[in-house]
Amino acid sequence: MLFGHKRRQVLVALLLGTSAVGMWLTWPWIVPLVSPVPTSIAGSDLVVVLDGGSGRFAAADRMGHALPQRPQRLLIRCPRGTPPPQPTPELLQGFDTATQVTALAHWLRHQPSPRSARVWIATDPDHTARAVVLARIALGSQGIRVGPADWPTPSSAERRRLLPDALRLTLWQATGSTVARLFPGALARKRADCGV
């Protein structure tokens, strides 16, 4: 009888531990769903352009015009990327979507209060879904909402990249690393293309 009781305690402890780890890892996904949508006050919206390109700047302009208050803007690009057509604050960090989003999360975490409450990701239509999901994972635990809420259906190539990148960002939340070092060939190629 004693052995059965101990076994039950171990199973309960494992179940509780697994639940706690699962909740911790999914918390960035859950927070944006249950937290209220912040109202737009001056300076609370930030439109982020991931790597410059005329289409991405045009998307940022459309987003900015659709908001009730003029948003702040930020460009995250590779040093070899296209410079913006107009002066825009820049982060020259990140060599792929995952590392650009983690650079954004780090930058936002160190901004003085009041920080941006909503972040709008401006990128190519095919890239929007993956970029927004990754930004929600990285910024959700900070209570920052990420949009746009509606995006075009991504190509099959983009959909294939979504799950591995989402797992990278979930691991980044847990460990502080996007595990890019585990793929040295891809890492070297991306860094060379980006100029870092």
Predicted segment positions?
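Extended, histidine- and acidic-residue-enriched regions that form the cofactor-binding/catalytic faces
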Residues: 11, 184, 194-196
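General helical structural elements
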Residues: 11-12, 60, 172
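A transmembrane-helix-recognition feature enriched in membrane-embedded lipid enzymes
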Residues: 157-186
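Short, surface-exposed, charged/polar-biased interaction segments
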Residues: 140-142, 184-191
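Hydrophobic membrane-insertion alpha-helices, especially the h-region
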Residues: 9-28
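A structural signal for short, hydrophobic/glycine-enriched beta-strand patches
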Residues: 28-163
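Trafficking entry modules
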Residues: 41, 191-194
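N-terminal Lys/Arg-rich, disordered targeting/topogenic segments
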Residues: 1-7
